[in-house]
């Protein structure tokens, strides 16, 4: 069998750089190397691109992915062809956060006409920006919790008015979030005004725009979506926390969360969640993969929280685990995503770019 040429891209100029490397290690150790010839590109914290070709061995130490002994190359040359001299059948970006999950690198792949795994420019950018995403959900009629949003420059000029707006529109606890980050980076749970001001200061270290959301006593439930024009969903899974707030540290360092798959919910609630996940997928014109996150209250009210266009993708993350529960292994999920990338690229070829 002739191997397909795949390039995995990871790292990136983002606060989620280390998460991306962990994801790359997991994917590289699970991808079917009998089917694929795999090259890797590492984007350093400084934005340099480094390439290593024909990865065949298990990645035992994550530090080996830093490519400290390799010189940086020119981006378009690195992406032009694989180690066997042929064009790539697909690029697999494993990038989280700004400069990777926000439509920027997807735009590069589009300009270079490269097939790539995951969401396109519009879906990636709108899913990354929490305010835009919420506005699209609102247009689609999906129920959400109350929120407000403002810019750093607005807060610097009108701090008192904004603090009053939070008091008038929301009740404590509230969650302060950078508008354009994932993995719970820069997010704070605030129970009073002092914590609110500290949380705003923390969030503005990571973004010029933030969102403050109403807190709620509810279960956190997630649904995985996979596909292009005709996506499929999983049964929901639940995040079980040993901490008050599911932050970056508890997600990736402390091991203080576990996953309940499938979630213990009435079947009617589960089906509603799956249907809402499909609506959210369509609302932002997604393709490839999405994880839709919800709140479910004790009386089974459902509120959509967000969609994640590049969800956590380590072997123990919720998204692959949900598909594992549906009978799709981690390795086969990787293969399916590559096939979806090629399918979307073939569909793009049907478009005309000239006028007769």
Swiss-Prot record:
Cell wall formation. Belongs to the D-alanine--D-alanine ligase family. GO terms for molecular function: ATP binding; D-alanine-D-alanine ligase activity; metal ion binding. It catalyses: 2 D-alanine + ATP = D-alanyl-D-alanine + ADP + phosphate + H(+). It is an enzyme of class 6 (ligase). Mg(2+) 1 binds at residues 293, 306. Residues 134-339 form the ATP-grasp domain. It comes from Staphylococcus haemolyticus (strain JCSC1435). Its cofactor is Mg(2+); Mn(2+). The lineage of its organism: Bacteria, Bacillati, Bacillota, Bacilli, Bacillales. The gene is ddl. InterPro entries: ATP-grasp (IPR011761), ATP_grasp_subdomain_1 (IPR013815), D-Ala_lig_Van_CS (IPR000291), D_ala_D_ala (IPR005905), Dala_Dala_lig_C (IPR011095), Dala_Dala_lig_N (IPR011127), PreATP-grasp_dom_sf (IPR016185). This is D-alanine--D-alanine ligase. Its EC number is 6.3.2.4. ATP binds at residues 167-222. Pathway: Cell wall biogenesis; peptidoglycan biosynthesis.
